[in-house]
């Protein structure tokens, strides 16, 4: 950071990536809460030597910068203060004859979260707006789930009997599509053998145990409700634009799905085709069926299937929501991006929260291949004359 960048920060004030502390004589205890918050969220800059004066900020400087820096970093790196190492880069600046200390804090990798203080996981902080806030228990549980080497969707599910675990219609739908897309597999293979072959059943002695992925993709209503006590998807068709205030009648139609992913997709597709215009284009030369999907269907399908694949199903306090406004579509998903959100637009494989669910959808070509979907959605949507899609993590 140079002096001009620092002046811009002082003018803009505190926000989610910068925190000012007066810290003239000693390290404030709240500085470590900021370290936890930045490391658990998206990183940021912690600046010593700047005091808040009403709605503005005054450069006060640090009286003994060498001692202040050493005291702060030695406590930070002590085993008892934070539970995980945090990458901190220090910088010193002389502004208006006063010394300012700047600490650039990097976000920790998901395997090294949550970052908490004094050995107490309840002292986990998150950065929200211009403040540091104690994480709620559901936030802590989410970070712990994401930190484990075992993915949630690969864990065994044993809450119902195997013969009650699956929805036969969903398995048939999937197998029909699988054999259309993939040649060389035996269409007469028994269902259990197929599911075991692709890792959706685990063997325990002589019995099979389904995984969480198997239940989310193929599960019976009983099994799905035992696994996630909240809807899979909430779809709202709204009669106003995203910028308009909410009217007394909130929606034209609404669909709440509490079934598996395949059933959720089929129900969503029926609603989508009912509400969206369907101009006839031509005849499919293979199936001889009408090709009249709405414009932008490929983009919608990718966004919707991504919503079903990548949500944090272990979070029982929130649900995925699709809102059809008059001027756009909003997809809201529980859970932040599992990997590095700065690489979302790059080609190639990415870390995903639910790899078994993702592969199930890719095997039947219900979504784009790994590393291509985000760019496809952006390019195809703009080709149709729409603004570039807006993404927020």
Labelled PLM ranges:
Residues 25, 349-363:
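Short, hydrophobic/aliphatic alpha-helical segments
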Residues 29-32, 66-70, 297, 354, ...:
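Amphipathic alpha-helical transducer elements in NTP-driven molecular machines
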Residues 39-40, 93-94, 217, 323, ...:
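Well-ordered beta-strand positions
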Residues 83-163, 315-318, 364, 368-371, ...:
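Intrinsically disordered, low-complexity regulatory tails
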Residues 1-46, 50-102, 109-111:
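Polybasic/polar functional segments that serve as interface/processing modules
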Residues 127-316, 324-325, 329, 335-351, ...:
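Active-site helix-to-loop segments that bind/position phosphate- or nucleotide-bearing substrates
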Residues 19, 47-49, 101-104, 215-217, ...:
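Structured core elements
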Residues 13, 39-46, 76-83, 109, ...:
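Conserved NTP-handling cores and scaffolds of large molecular machines
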């Amino acid at each position: 950071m140079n002096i001009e960048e620092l002046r811009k920060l002082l003018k803009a004030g505190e926000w989610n990536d910068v925190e000012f502390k007066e810290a003239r004589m000693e390290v404030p205890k709240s500085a470590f809460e900021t370290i936890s918050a930045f490391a658990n969220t998206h990183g940021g800059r912690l600046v010593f030597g700047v005091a808040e004066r009403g709605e503005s900020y005054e450069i006060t400087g640090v009286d003994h910068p060498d001692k202040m820096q050493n005291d702060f970093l030695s406590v930070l790196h002590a085993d008892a203060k934070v539970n995980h190492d945090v990458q901190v880069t220090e910088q010193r600046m002389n502004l208006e004859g006063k010394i300012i200390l700047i600490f650039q804090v990097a976000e920790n990798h998901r395997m090294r979260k949550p970052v908490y203080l004094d050995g107490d996981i309840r002292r986990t902080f998150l950065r929200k707006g211009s403040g540091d806030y104690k994480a709620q228990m559901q936030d802590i549980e989410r970070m712990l789930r994401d930190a484990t080497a075992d993915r949630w969707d690969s864990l065994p599910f044993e809450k119902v009997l195997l013969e009650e675990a699956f929805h036969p219609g969903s398995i048939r739908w999937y197998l029909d599509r699988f054999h259309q897309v993939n040649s060389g597999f035996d269409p007469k293979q028994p269902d259990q053998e197929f599911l075991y072959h692709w890792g959706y059943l685990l063997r325990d002695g002589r019995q099979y145990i389904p995984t969480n992925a198997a239940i989310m993709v193929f599960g019976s209503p009983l099994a799905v409700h035992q696994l996630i006590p909240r809807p899979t998807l909430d779809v709202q068709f709204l009669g106003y634009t995203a910028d308009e205030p909410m009217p007394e009648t909130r929606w034209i139609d609404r669909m709440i799905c509490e079934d598996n992913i395949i059933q959720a997709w089929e129900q969503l597709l029926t609603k989508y085709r009912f509400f969206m215009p369907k101009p006839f284009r031509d005849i499919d030369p293979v199936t001889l069926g009408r090709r009249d999907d709405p414009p932008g269907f490929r983009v919608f399908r990718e966004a919707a299937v991504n919503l079903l694949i990548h949500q944090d199903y272990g979070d029982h306090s929130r649900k995925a929501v699709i809102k059809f406004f008059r001027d756009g579509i909003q997809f809201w998903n529980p859970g932040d991006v599992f990997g590095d959100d700065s690489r979302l637009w790059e080609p190639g494989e990415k870390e995903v929260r639910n790899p078994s669910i993702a592969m199930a959808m890719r095997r039947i070509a219900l979504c784009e291949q790994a590393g291509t979907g985000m760019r496809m959605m952006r390019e195809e949507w703009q080709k149709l004359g729409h603004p570039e899609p807006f993404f927020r993590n």
